[in-house]
């Protein structure tokens, strides 16, 4: 280990930066974040440094550095573009026993700056010992995705309530077990959502229950949008909740790759629906979610796309609210957005479509339900049809019957955003026969409008079939 990783308290301590360029500005920001009293010495300085000096936030000395300028500081940074000046700063600092950092010159450094993940008061520092700052930044980026943005809120909550929890649970081992459970429970999740007051209430209720040696109600439900298929399109919160879940209740649009992200010991319950054949009635799904949470489980209700766009998420949270079950909703990339993007079809375009309409195209008793055809045939808009595969012939026929030109472009996307994506482009008149000849199966999405014609020049994603030379682009 070439460097000892430590965190240095610099609040109100005098620190010196020599240099006034962009690098100096970056180092200045770090020192100010740490509360240091900063002096900058530079022959000329960036406007932001001058502004900070004018506001009295730093001291700026416009001059050439001299060895005597280093006296009286607790930490010095050399950030000029002149190697000789930087070396002189390092020599002067060492003569006075002051730790010095020379930017981009590890051999002259007493300390180095790591890549920082700041979730104050939680800080994570990553360093390669100066070997490769770029590699350190890349590693920081990976770690960033693992630490929720409001992790500091959770840390502050634990700090603020630490003494009250100690009084409620005086026995150290019991208190440690309490914190281990709590920092992965509903109170923690509320804090990570930014709901600090609710988190405090739930945490104190749990502490009181633990003091009485009662089992607290730890369960909760998260309605999570799994996106259109590609696992890389999951949100960071969705990924975290999937990996933390005790039980996952999922539908048929959730891919095996996404389910594989869950813990191995997580219970998986299939609740998919295929046309009118439901594996579990919706009312039973609603009750199942509430019952699983009441048993103390962290439940993820995992839905393809977005839970509030043709996902019946509203019905499920009504039941949870009625039962007093803590819940949250995590939006996902809906199929319309994801599939259109991967097919190279913009849903809006200044020259072609000023509006976009989402409709459900599933059949009930062999007929389409309650669609406003006069609105759907209007020009300069894009119509996106979910669940429309079986009703495609009727949808196209009704649009033509109500005034849409038979030549209006239309596309059907099968398994959008996945390696097996297939895109068929045609017109309202020809798409049904083309789909029938291709043997298309669900899940699919239908896009109707002039924007479909842009696919010829905007298509960028190549599925496995297209890569092998069997493109479905018509």
Curated annotation (Swiss-Prot):
Q: Spell out the SUPFAM superfamilies in the cross-references.
A: NAD(P)-binding Rossmann-fold domains (SSF51735), Siroheme synthase middle domains-like (SSF75615), Tetrapyrrole methylase (SSF53790)
Q: What is its EC number?
A: 2.1.1.107, 1.3.1.76, 4.99.1.4
Please give the pathway this protein is involved in. Cofactor biosynthesis; adenosylcobalamin biosynthesis; precorrin-2 from uroporphyrinogen III: step 1/1; Cofactor biosynthesis; adenosylcobalamin biosynthesis; sirohydrochlorin from precorrin-2: step 1/1; Porphyrin-containing compound metabolism; siroheme biosynthesis; precorrin-2 from uroporphyrinogen III: step 1/1; Porphyrin-containing compound metabolism; siroheme biosynthesis; siroheme from sirohydrochlorin: step 1/1
Region annotated Uroporphyrinogen-III C-methyltransferase sits at: 219-474
Is S-adenosyl-L-methionine there in the keyword field? yes
Give GO terms: molecular function aspect only: NAD binding; precorrin-2 dehydrogenase activity; sirohydrochlorin ferrochelatase activity; uroporphyrin-III C-methyltransferase activity
Q: Which stretches of sequence are listed as region Precorrin-2 dehydrogenase /sirohydrochlorin ferrochelatase?
A: 1-203
Give me any GO biological process, just one.
siroheme biosynthetic process
Residues annotated to bind NAD(+): 22-23, 43-44
Q: Where does S-adenosyl-L-methionine bind?
A: 228, 304-306, 309, 334-335, 387, 416
Keyword list (alphabetical) reads: Cobalamin biosynthesis, Lyase, Methyltransferase, Multifunctional enzyme, NAD, Oxidoreductase, Porphyrin biosynthesis, S-adenosyl-L-methionine, Transferase
- The residues annotated as the active site are 251 (proton acceptor), 273 (proton donor)
Q: Which Pfam families match?
A: CysG_dimeriser, NAD_binding_7, Sirohm_synth_M, TP_methylase
Enumerate the catalysed reactions: uroporphyrinogen III + 2 S-adenosyl-L-methionine = precorrin-2 + 2 S-adenosyl-L-homocysteine + H(+); precorrin-2 + NAD(+) = sirohydrochlorin + NADH + 2 H(+); siroheme + 2 H(+) = sirohydrochlorin + Fe(2+)
**Top-level division of the source organism's lineage:** Bacteria
Query: Does the record's keyword annotation contain Transmembrane?
Result: no
Role description: Then it catalyzes the NAD-dependent ring dehydrogenation of precorrin-2 to yield sirohydrochlorin. Finally, it catalyzes the ferrochelation of sirohydrochlorin to yield siroheme.
User: Which family does the record claim for this protein?
Assistant: In the N-terminal section; belongs to the precorrin-2 dehydrogenase / sirohydrochlorin ferrochelatase family.
Q: What is this protein identified as? A: Siroheme synthase
From what organism does this protein derive?
Methylococcus capsulatus (strain ATCC 33009 / NCIMB 11132 / Bath)
- Gene assigned in the entry: cysG
């Amino acid at each position: 280990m070439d460097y000892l990783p430590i965190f240095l308290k610099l609040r109100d301590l005098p620190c010196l930066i020599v240099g006034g360029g962009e690098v100096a500005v970056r180092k200045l920001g770090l020192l100010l974040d740490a509360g240091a009293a900063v002096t900058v010495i530079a022959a000329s300085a960036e406007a932001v440094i001058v502004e900070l000096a004018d506001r009295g936030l730093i001291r700026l000395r416009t001059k050439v550095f001299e060895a005597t300028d280093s006296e009286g500081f607790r930490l010095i940074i050399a950030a000029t573009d002149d190697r000789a000046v930087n070396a002189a700063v390092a020599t002067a600092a060492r003569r006075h026993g002051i730790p010095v950092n020379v930017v981009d010159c590890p051999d002259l450094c007493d300390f180095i700056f790591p890549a920082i993940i700041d979730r104050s008061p939680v800080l994570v520092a990553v360093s390669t010992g100066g070997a490769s700052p770029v590699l350190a930044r890349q590693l920081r980026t990976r770690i960033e995705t693992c630490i929720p943005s409001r992790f500091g809120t959770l840390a502050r909550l634990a700090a603020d309530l630490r003494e009250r929890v100690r009084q409620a649970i005086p026995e150290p081992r019991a208190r440690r077990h309490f914190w281990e459970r709590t920092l992965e429970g509903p109170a923690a999740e509320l804090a990570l959502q930014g709901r600090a007051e609710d988190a405090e209430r739930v945490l104190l209720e749990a502490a009181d229950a633990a003091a009485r040696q009662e089992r607290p109600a730890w369960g909760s439900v998260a309605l999570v949008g799994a996106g259109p298929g590609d696992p890389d399109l999951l949100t960071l919160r969705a990924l975290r909740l999937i990996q933390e879940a005790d039980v996952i209740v999922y539908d048929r649009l959730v891919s095996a790759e996404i389910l594989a992200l869950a813990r191995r010991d997580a219970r998986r319950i299939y609740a998919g629906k295929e046309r009118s054949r439901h594996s579990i009635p919706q009312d039973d799904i609603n009750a199942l979610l509430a019952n699983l949470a009441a048993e103390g489980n962290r439940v993820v209700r995992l839905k393809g796309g977005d839970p509030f766009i043709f996902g019946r998420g509203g019905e499920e949270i009504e039941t949870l609210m009625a039962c007093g079950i803590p819940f949250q909703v995590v939006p996902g990339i809906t199929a319309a957005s994801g599939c259109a993007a991967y097919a190279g079809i913009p849903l809006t375009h200044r020259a072609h479509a000023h509006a976009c309409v989402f409709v459900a195209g599933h059949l009930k008793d062999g007929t389409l339900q309650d669609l406003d055809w006069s609105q759907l045939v209007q020009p300069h808009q894009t119509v996106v049809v979910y669940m429309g595969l079986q009703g495609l012939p009727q949808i196209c026929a009704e649009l033509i019957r109500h005034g849409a030109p038979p030549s209006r472009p239309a596309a059907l996307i099968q398994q959008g955003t996945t390696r097996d994506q297939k895109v068929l482009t045609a017109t309202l008149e020809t798409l049904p026969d083309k789909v029938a000849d291709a043997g298309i199966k669900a899940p699919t999405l239908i896009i109707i409008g002039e924007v479909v014609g842009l696919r010829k020049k905007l298509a960028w994603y190549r599925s496995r079939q297209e890569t092998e030379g069997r493109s479905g682009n018509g």
